[in-house]
Amino acid sequence: LLRRRGLSTAILDADVTGPSIPKAFGVHEQLMATDEGICPAASTTGVKLVSLNLLLENETDPVVWRGPVIAGAVKQFWTDVMWGDVDFMFVDMPPGTGDVPLTVFQSLPVDGILIVTSPQELVGMIVEKAVNMARMMNVPVLGIVENMSYFQCDECGKKHEIFGRSHLDEIAAQCEIPRTARMPLNPALAAACDAGKIEMFDGDWLDELAGEIAAL
Protein backbone atom coordinates (compact mmCIF):
# COMPACT_ATOMS: atom_id res chain seq x y z
CA LEU A 1 0.00 0.00 0.00
CA LEU A 2 2.83 2.41 0.75
CA ARG A 3 4.51 1.49 -2.52
CA ARG A 4 1.31 2.48 -4.31
CA ARG A 5 1.68 5.89 -2.68
CA GLY A 6 5.05 6.31 -4.39
CA LEU A 7 7.15 5.48 -1.33
CA SER A 8 10.27 3.32 -1.52
CA THR A 9 9.39 0.18 0.43
CA ALA A 10 11.29 -2.91 1.60
CA ILE A 11 10.46 -6.09 3.50
CA LEU A 12 12.92 -7.97 5.68
CA ASP A 13 11.50 -11.45 6.24
CA ALA A 14 12.58 -12.28 9.80
CA ASP A 15 10.27 -15.30 9.99
CA VAL A 16 13.29 -17.44 9.20
CA THR A 17 11.76 -20.88 9.75
CA GLY A 18 8.40 -20.06 8.13
CA PRO A 19 9.10 -17.56 5.36
CA SER A 20 6.06 -16.80 3.21
CA ILE A 21 6.82 -13.32 1.89
CA PRO A 22 8.56 -14.38 -1.36
CA LYS A 23 5.69 -16.66 -2.40
CA ALA A 24 3.06 -13.99 -1.73
CA PHE A 25 4.99 -11.53 -3.91
CA GLY A 26 5.80 -14.07 -6.63
CA VAL A 27 9.56 -13.80 -6.10
CA HIS A 28 11.54 -17.03 -6.45
CA GLU A 29 14.97 -16.07 -7.82
CA GLN A 30 17.89 -16.65 -5.47
CA LEU A 31 19.58 -13.60 -3.98
CA MET A 32 22.87 -12.50 -5.51
CA ALA A 33 25.92 -11.41 -3.53
CA THR A 34 28.80 -9.10 -4.47
CA ASP A 35 31.90 -7.92 -2.64
CA GLU A 36 29.80 -5.06 -1.25
CA GLY A 37 27.03 -7.26 0.13
CA ILE A 38 23.80 -9.07 -0.70
CA CYS A 39 21.53 -7.58 -3.36
CA PRO A 40 17.86 -7.64 -2.32
CA ALA A 41 15.30 -9.12 -4.66
CA ALA A 42 12.61 -6.88 -6.13
CA SER A 43 8.92 -7.54 -6.64
CA THR A 44 6.88 -6.56 -9.69
CA THR A 45 6.23 -3.06 -8.34
CA GLY A 46 9.72 -2.57 -6.94
CA VAL A 47 9.35 -3.63 -3.30
CA LYS A 48 12.77 -4.80 -2.07
CA LEU A 49 12.72 -8.24 -0.42
CA VAL A 50 15.13 -10.35 1.57
CA SER A 51 14.16 -13.77 2.89
CA LEU A 52 16.00 -16.94 3.80
CA ASN A 53 13.85 -18.77 1.26
CA LEU A 54 15.66 -16.78 -1.44
CA LEU A 55 18.96 -18.24 -0.26
CA LEU A 56 17.92 -21.90 -0.19
CA GLU A 57 18.69 -24.22 -3.09
CA ASN A 58 15.16 -25.60 -2.79
CA GLU A 59 12.50 -23.30 -1.33
CA THR A 60 10.74 -26.27 0.32
CA ASP A 61 13.84 -27.27 2.31
CA PRO A 62 13.22 -26.92 6.08
CA VAL A 63 15.35 -24.57 8.16
CA VAL A 64 16.35 -26.56 11.24
CA TRP A 65 18.26 -23.96 13.21
CA ARG A 66 18.49 -23.08 16.87
CA GLY A 67 17.66 -19.62 18.20
CA PRO A 68 21.15 -18.05 18.14
CA VAL A 69 21.70 -19.04 14.50
CA ILE A 70 18.31 -17.63 13.52
CA ALA A 71 19.09 -14.42 15.38
CA GLY A 72 22.40 -14.18 13.54
CA ALA A 73 20.66 -14.55 10.17
CA VAL A 74 18.22 -11.75 11.02
CA LYS A 75 21.12 -9.46 11.96
CA GLN A 76 22.87 -10.26 8.67
CA PHE A 77 19.73 -9.44 6.70
CA TRP A 78 20.04 -5.95 8.15
CA THR A 79 23.82 -5.43 8.10
CA ASP A 80 24.91 -7.35 4.98
CA VAL A 81 22.16 -6.38 2.52
CA MET A 82 22.52 -3.35 0.26
CA TRP A 83 19.11 -1.86 0.97
CA GLY A 84 19.87 1.58 -0.45
CA ASP A 85 17.47 4.45 0.18
CA VAL A 86 14.20 3.16 1.64
CA ASP A 87 11.30 5.23 2.99
CA PHE A 88 9.66 2.35 4.86
CA MET A 89 11.02 -1.06 5.79
CA PHE A 90 8.72 -3.72 7.21
CA VAL A 91 10.16 -6.57 9.26
CA ASP A 92 7.91 -9.63 9.19
CA MET A 93 8.36 -11.49 12.48
CA PRO A 94 7.03 -14.84 13.74
CA PRO A 95 4.41 -14.84 16.52
CA GLY A 96 5.46 -14.58 20.13
CA THR A 97 8.16 -12.83 22.12
CA GLY A 98 11.14 -15.07 21.43
CA ASP A 99 14.60 -14.69 19.93
CA VAL A 100 13.59 -13.00 16.69
CA PRO A 101 11.58 -10.08 18.14
CA LEU A 102 14.27 -9.56 20.78
CA THR A 103 16.98 -9.52 18.09
CA VAL A 104 15.00 -7.10 15.93
CA PHE A 105 14.31 -4.72 18.81
CA GLN A 106 17.94 -4.78 19.97
CA SER A 107 19.77 -4.79 16.62
CA LEU A 108 17.62 -2.78 14.21
CA PRO A 109 16.62 0.90 14.47
CA VAL A 110 12.91 0.11 14.82
CA ASP A 111 10.59 3.14 14.73
CA GLY A 112 7.49 1.19 15.76
CA ILE A 113 5.58 -2.07 15.43
CA LEU A 114 2.23 -3.16 14.05
CA ILE A 115 0.66 -6.07 15.88
CA VAL A 116 -1.43 -8.60 13.94
CA THR A 117 -3.99 -10.56 15.92
CA SER A 118 -7.14 -12.65 15.40
CA PRO A 119 -10.60 -12.53 17.01
CA GLN A 120 -10.23 -15.36 19.53
CA GLU A 121 -10.34 -14.11 23.11
CA LEU A 122 -7.28 -16.20 24.00
CA VAL A 123 -5.18 -14.15 21.60
CA GLY A 124 -5.75 -11.04 23.72
CA MET A 125 -3.28 -12.30 26.32
CA ILE A 126 -0.66 -12.90 23.63
CA VAL A 127 -1.17 -9.39 22.27
CA GLU A 128 -0.62 -7.94 25.73
CA LYS A 129 2.67 -9.84 25.98
CA ALA A 130 3.80 -8.41 22.63
CA VAL A 131 2.77 -4.88 23.63
CA ASN A 132 4.55 -5.17 26.97
CA MET A 133 7.70 -6.48 25.30
CA ALA A 134 7.72 -3.61 22.81
CA ARG A 135 7.31 -1.04 25.55
CA MET A 136 10.03 -2.68 27.65
CA MET A 137 12.32 -2.16 24.64
CA ASN A 138 11.06 1.42 24.15
CA VAL A 139 9.49 0.60 20.78
CA PRO A 140 6.21 2.44 20.05
CA VAL A 141 3.15 0.36 19.17
CA LEU A 142 1.76 2.09 16.07
CA GLY A 143 -1.40 0.04 15.63
CA ILE A 144 -3.10 -3.33 15.70
CA VAL A 145 -4.67 -5.29 12.83
CA GLU A 146 -7.25 -8.01 13.43
CA ASN A 147 -6.83 -10.65 10.74
CA MET A 148 -9.68 -13.03 9.83
CA SER A 149 -12.00 -10.60 11.61
CA TYR A 150 -15.11 -11.57 9.66
CA PHE A 151 -16.39 -13.10 6.44
CA GLN A 152 -18.58 -10.95 4.20
CA CYS A 153 -21.08 -12.81 2.05
CA ASP A 154 -20.80 -11.88 -1.64
CA GLU A 155 -24.52 -12.37 -2.21
CA CYS A 156 -26.15 -10.54 0.72
CA GLY A 157 -23.24 -8.45 2.02
CA LYS A 158 -23.78 -9.62 5.60
CA LYS A 159 -20.69 -9.92 7.79
CA HIS A 160 -20.27 -13.17 9.72
CA GLU A 161 -17.84 -13.34 12.65
CA ILE A 162 -16.60 -16.86 11.97
CA PHE A 163 -14.15 -16.96 14.88
CA GLY A 164 -16.39 -15.21 17.38
CA ARG A 165 -17.01 -11.63 18.40
CA SER A 166 -14.22 -9.18 17.74
CA HIS A 167 -12.25 -8.00 20.76
CA LEU A 168 -10.16 -5.52 18.78
CA ASP A 169 -11.54 -2.31 20.27
CA GLU A 170 -11.32 -3.68 23.81
CA ILE A 171 -7.70 -4.78 23.36
CA ALA A 172 -6.74 -1.49 21.71
CA ALA A 173 -8.31 0.50 24.55
CA GLN A 174 -6.79 -1.67 27.26
CA CYS A 175 -3.32 -1.52 25.72
CA GLU A 176 -3.65 2.12 24.63
CA ILE A 177 -2.99 1.32 20.98
CA PRO A 178 -3.90 4.36 18.83
CA ARG A 179 -4.80 2.76 15.49
CA THR A 180 -6.85 -0.28 14.50
CA ALA A 181 -7.86 -2.07 11.31
CA ARG A 182 -9.79 -5.22 10.43
CA MET A 183 -8.96 -7.73 7.71
CA PRO A 184 -11.71 -10.13 6.60
CA LEU A 185 -11.49 -13.75 5.57
CA ASN A 186 -11.39 -13.21 1.81
CA PRO A 187 -10.93 -16.07 -0.68
CA ALA A 188 -9.75 -13.69 -3.41
CA LEU A 189 -7.00 -12.33 -1.16
CA ALA A 190 -5.89 -15.86 -0.27
CA ALA A 191 -5.82 -16.78 -3.96
CA ALA A 192 -3.73 -13.69 -4.76
CA CYS A 193 -1.17 -14.69 -2.12
CA ASP A 194 -1.04 -18.26 -3.43
CA ALA A 195 -0.53 -16.97 -6.98
CA GLY A 196 2.21 -14.53 -5.96
CA LYS A 197 0.09 -11.53 -6.92
CA ILE A 198 -0.54 -9.88 -3.57
CA GLU A 199 0.54 -6.51 -5.01
CA MET A 200 -2.18 -6.67 -7.65
CA PHE A 201 -4.96 -7.28 -5.14
CA ASP A 202 -7.36 -4.39 -4.65
CA GLY A 203 -8.64 -4.16 -1.07
CA ASP A 204 -9.21 -1.03 0.99
CA TRP A 205 -9.23 -2.51 4.51
CA LEU A 206 -5.80 -1.15 5.42
CA ASP A 207 -5.87 2.11 3.44
CA GLU A 208 -6.64 4.36 6.39
CA LEU A 209 -4.00 2.72 8.57
CA ALA A 210 -1.40 2.94 5.80
CA GLY A 211 -2.17 6.61 5.27
CA GLU A 212 -1.75 7.40 8.96
CA ILE A 213 1.56 5.52 9.13
CA ALA A 214 2.83 7.23 5.97
CA ALA A 215 2.09 10.59 7.60
CA LEU A 216 4.11 9.85 10.76
What do the predicted segments below correspond to?
Residues V50, M93, Q106, L142, ...:
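Glycine-rich phosphate-binding loops of nucleotide-dependent enzymes
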Residues R3, F105:
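Gly/Ala-rich phosphate-binding loop of Rossmann-like dinucleotide-binding domains
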Residues L56-V104:
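Phosphate-binding/switch loop-helix module in NTP-utilizing enzymes
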Residues D13, I21, V50, V74, ...:
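Residue-level signature of catalytic and energy-coupling elements of molecular machines
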Residues R5-T60, V64, A71:
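Phosphate-binding loop that captures ATP/GTP phosphates
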Residues V131-L216:
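C-terminal lobe/tail of nucleotide-utilizing enzymes
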Residues G84-V91, T97-G98, P109-A130:
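Conserved Switch II/interswitch segment of TRAFAC-class P-loop GTPases
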Residues V16-G18, L55-E57, P95-T97, P119-V123, ...:
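Conserved nucleotide-binding/hydrolysis micro-motifs of P-loop NTPases
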